[in-house]
Curated annotation (Swiss-Prot):
Signal peptide: none annotated. SUPFAM superfamilies: C-terminal UvrC-binding domain of UvrB, GIY-YIG endonuclease, RuvA domain 2-like. This is UvrABC system protein C. Keywords: Cytoplasm, DNA damage, DNA excision, DNA repair, Excision nuclease, SOS response. The lineage of its organism: Bacteria, Bacillati, Bacillota, Clostridia, Thermoanaerobacterales. It is found in: Cytoplasm. The UvrABC repair system catalyzes the recognition and processing of DNA lesions. UvrC both incises the 5' and 3' sides of the lesion. The N-terminal half is responsible for the 3' incision and the C-terminal half is responsible for the 5' incision. One of its GO terms (molecular function) is excinuclease ABC activity. Pfam families: GIY-YIG (PF01541), HHH_5 (PF14520), UVR (PF02151), UvrC_RNaseH (PF22920), UvrC_RNaseH_dom (PF08459). Belongs to the UvrC family. Residues 12-91 form the GIY-YIG domain. PROSITE patterns: GIY_YIG, UVR, UVRC. PANTHER family: UVRABC SYSTEM PROTEIN C (PTHR30562:SF1), UVRC/OXIDOREDUCTASE (PTHR30562).
Length: 615
């Protein structure tokens, strides 16, 4: 049966539709209030669809549907199918199967606390999900310091009295129920306290502990009272770090989102008893072209589908298309009413704005980390091209002059693929007459590495601090803006100084664009589409920019200095003439009338300049 024939048979009932590709793989799952209307929209208005939907439809070879009695049932089925199949074109909670939880096995006689990535219907209590394994392990460590409950899988009843206390008992992270150091009743009380702490009910827990401490003191159990007192202090210290974000004893999850071109970051603040008890951020993929409300709705469905706990209220900052339906679904899972709130003013609005700012920061940090990793990969790619393991520090050199005048050299530095401008260096060419790029390059390289040798000697003698040195750090790779002649000039200097560093010329094509690298072994053609090519082009452009900027600065100084020798020409007129003509040669060719047109010039000053260059 063709898709067109199937479309005619769609019922006017709620349900779930399943898109499949030519291999029968599920690539998209959606729900509909009316299957007939929703599914037909895809195939009857293809040109009006989002680009991502158009791509998806180009792969659809078949579809199926499942009829449900209500839209709520359709939502529940949609959540289950997305979780099971993780279809390619659905908005997905990134790597949700890997998010870790804290598990407390309250279903066991002597409960344990542990790290897990699976929620099972085993009667245990689960807390999370957390965004990282590190966060889970640090939280478990903190809980065990205050409530020393076990993590091992010993059979306590069977091993009682047969084993010795482990290391965790001696460092205060376990109360050793296996050796009867604590009776069962007191151990269960510890576990209950740990659960209250993880639930965010810390004020209630402190009140309960104070009652226990008072009772222990009245019964002259002073050691026990002191232990409880220390517990209270530890809990209060952690509570001090929690920001009071709400009045009363509210249970809220506050959700907001920030996005880049290819990923969306969802930030969740968990408020328990009116205090911020934790926060986590998660990533959603396949969100290009989607509205914020759609993305947050998808997150809510996937996040709470397997969550061990659902709060009374979810606060977010955007209208959700399925707000009422989601509220009904969450209420069913929780067992009583769950409210979804979109505040426009007041305390709740301030809270959701704060969560948005945190989502934005988390996204910026993620982008920064991804850029760092990307840069490392680019440097590795470039290093492999030139036979190095990793060119951490790359130095690039260029020469700039105007027909031999105002001759300068420049050195730019890239560390881990990024420019390090604090280590750029400028060189006035002192010993080369006229325009000779090879000799100029020899001079720059010789001076740079002689400085390095001198500074290293001073550092070894203790006469120079390493962080004060300007040239001591040596490059792993040298680039020069030029061809094989420039490369050979640099290699000759380095050889004479006993230094061995790979040198490559950054050659250009007939249109003065970066083409590749050249060395005595030949030219390396690098495809323009590679990241290594783009890094080389960036280095070449930066070396050229830095050299020509310095050259123009020097030229400008000389130009203005020469003009100041002319009667009636001060700094202001000299600058105006430089801005207008850009070179001494152009001023020499200018007529009196041309000179008079420059801002601040008059007949007398123009005549003086004209005559000065015709003596």
């Amino acid at each position: 049966m063709t898709i067109e024939e199937k479309l005619k048979l769609l019922p006017e009932k709620p349900g779930v539709y399943i898109m499949k590709d030519k291999s029968g793989k599920i690539i998209y799952v959606g729900k509909a209030v009316v299957l007939k209307n929703r599914v037909r929209q895809y195939f009857q208005n293809k040109e009006k669809q989002l680009p991502k939907v158009k791509v998806m439809l180009s792969h659809v070879e078949d579809f199926e549907y499942i009829v449900t009695d209500t839209e709520l049932e359709a939502l529940m089925l949609e959540c289950n199918l997305i979780k099971k199949y993780k279809p390619k074109y659905n908005v997905l909670l990134k790597d949700d199967k890997n998010y870790p939880y804290i598990k407390v096995t309250v279903n066991e006689e002597y409960p344990r606390i542990m790290f897990t990535r699976r929620i099972e219907p085993d009667g245990a209590k689960y807390f999370g999900p957390y965004s990282s394994a590190f966060a889970v392990r640090e939280t478990i460590k903190l809980v065990r310091k205050m409530f020393p409950i076990r993590t091992c899988n010993k059979n306590i009843e069977k091993d009682m009295g047969k084993v010795r206390e482990c290391l965790y008992y001696h460092i205060g992270l376990c109360s050793a129920p296996c050796t009867n150091k604590i009776n069962k009743e007191d151990y269960i009380k510890l576990v209950d306290q740990a659960v209250l702490f993880l639930d965010g009910k810390r004020d209630w827990l402190i009140q309960k502990l104070k009652e226990d401490m008072k009772k222990a003191a009245e019964e002259l159990r002073f050691e026990e009272a002191a232990r409880i007192r220390d517990q209270i202090f530890a809990i209060e210290r952690t509570s001090e770090k929690q920001k009071v974000v709400s009045v009363g004893e509210d249970e809220q999850d506050i959700i907001s989102m920030a996005r880049s071109a290819d990923i969306s970051c969802i930030q969740v603040f968990f408020v328990r008893d009116g205090k911020l008890s934790g926060r986590e951020h998660y990533y959603m993929k396949n969100t290009e072209g989607m509205e914020r409300g759609e993305i947050i709705s998808s997150f809510i469905k996937q996040f709470y589908e397997g969550a061990p706990y659902i709060p009374k209220e979810i606060i977010t900052d955007v209208e959700l298309d399925e707000s009422e339906l989601l509220s009904e679904w969450l209420s069913q899972k929780r067992g009583n009413k769950v409210f979804i709130t979109i505040p426009v003013r007041g305390k709740k609005k301030e809270l959701v704005d704060m969560v948005y700012q945190n989502a934005l920061e988390a996204l910026k940090n993620d982008i920064s980390i991804r850029e760092e990793i990307s840069k490392d990969q680019v440097v590795l790619e470039l290093s492999n091209l030139v036979g190095l393991d990793y060119a951490k520090r790359i130095e690039a050199y260029d020469i700039s002059n105007t027909r031999g005048q105002d001759n300068v050299g420049s050195m730019v530095v890239f560390v881990d693929g990024k420019p390090k401008k604090s280590q750029y260096r400028k060189f006035n060419i002192k010993y080369v007459e006229g325009q000779d790029d090879y000799e100029s390059m020899r001079e720059v390289i010789e001076r740079r590495f002689l400085h390095a040798i001198e500074e290293k000697e001073l550092i070894e003698k203790g006469e120079l601090e390493e962080d004060k040195a300007k040239f001591a750090e040596m490059p792993d790779l040298i680039f020069v803006d030029g061809g094989i002649g420039h490369v050979n000039a640099v290699l000759q200097v380095l050889s004479g100084l006993g230094i061995s560093i790979p040198v490559y010329g950054m050659v250009k094509d007939s249109k003065h664009r970066t083409r590749g690298l050249v060395s005595p072994q030949g030219e390396i053609d690098i495809p323009m589409t590679t990241k290594a090519f783009r890094l080389i082009a960036q280095i070449q452009e930066e070396a050229h920019r830095f050299a020509i900027t310095f050259h123009k600065e020097k030229q400008s100084k000389r130009f203005k200095s020469e003009l100041l020798n002319i009667p009636g020409i001060g700094k202001k007129r000299a600058k105006a003439l430089y801005d207008a003509f850009k070179s001494i040669e152009e001023i020499k060719r200018a007529s009196v009338e041309d000179l008079k047109k420059v801002e601040g010039m008059n007949e007398k000053a123009a005549q003086a300049v004209y005559e000065y260059f015709r003596k």
